[in-house]
Amino acid sequence: MSIEFVGWLNTYYVGIDQSSYEASKLPGIRNVKGGIHLFTWSPTYPAGLISGVFAMVHEDMKYSIDFDSKSETASLQKLDVLYDENFYPFESTKDWDLLTKFITVQDLQRIFATEGEFFYLDTSTYVNADLVSQDPEFSKPSRDDKLLNFAEFNLRRSWSPSATGPERSKQAIDKSFLFQRLVQSVWNDNPISALAELSISFLSYSILSHYGALEHWKNMLSLLLQSYELAETEPEFYASFLELFKLQLSSLSESDLETSAIFEKGVLLSCLDSLSERKVDGSFGSLVNEAIENLLKTISELLNSHEEQAGLMQKGDLYSAADYEAEVHETGDYVIDVSTEEDPIH
């Protein structure tokens, strides 16, 4: 598959999947594998508004992304003919294939509430949780605004309405009942759609800096990490979830890892502790146990790296302070009072 970038201003960046390029240097790309891709554009990458389109593309098709400078919008088009001899060859990374392996067009159509194979969003696109926001300063979406329709659930009320006593207590701790209810009511009896939604929300945050998607990603993680019975009864599915989570964490940049506050307040770490305790108790099979060990190893490495990076930054601040002190001492052991000089600075 080939894709041409048409009409782009030199100040823009365009991207595919997890890569971004100056628009002026990228007339097009070729050899793109068929499947789910995310095309993005931004005038001030990586800061500022980032727009994009999730797309199911086909290897035997040709496409263009056309930029309209008046409206500052872009659209993805199918083409009959495209001369791509001067386009750059593109190769999807193995990580991208794994990060999107669970996503189908049907999952995207459900979340974006639209037909077709192209699904547009940007950093500011509303999510359905915004409809019930209690923040008086928050502008709620209008009827015409685009909306991401993520699964809605309340982790604090994860039990069946008919559950009482010990059963209710169990379902308050173990979110498996809530997960299965969502599988039936939202994900069309297909638990893999939960992993698709986890993937879409993660990519929307990590690539488009969408913070509504970030909150949903963390809620989905909390739901799945506390679904202990699910880990026992569906080991292959649960190991796939843990492997996906591990890959997502590994693909986050240092700044995204910090901005996401993924381990702040101890919520997810507490979930992981509970999961580890059940592993030690022998609750899970070898497949899930191995996936837990691999995930915990990755988290440990990321946290250690993050602490080292923070330490280096702190050292940098100390060095800057030391350099400043050295400069001061080179001029003498006192501070010059400019008001005593002949030509004071006003």
From Swiss-Prot:
Alphabetically ordered keywords of this record: Cytoplasm, mRNA processing, mRNA splicing, Nucleus, Phosphoprotein
GO cellular component terms listed in the entry, alphabetical order: cytosol; nucleus; spliceosomal complex; U5 snRNP
Cytoplasm among keywords: yes
Pfam families: AAR2, AAR2_1st
Protein name (Swiss-Prot/TrEMBL): A1 cistron-splicing factor aar2
Family to which this protein belongs: Belongs to the AAR2 family.
Biological processes per GO annotation: mRNA cis splicing, via spliceosome; spliceosomal tri-snRNP complex assembly
Disulfide bonds: none
Function: Component of the U5 snRNP complex that is required for spliceosome assembly and for pre-mRNA splicing. Involved in splicing pre-mRNA of the A1 cistron and other genes that are important for cell growth.
CDD domains assigned: Aar2_C, Aar2_N
Cell compartment(s), UniProt: Cytoplasm; Nucleus
Residues with Phosphoserine modification: 160
Primary localization class, coarse: cytoplasm
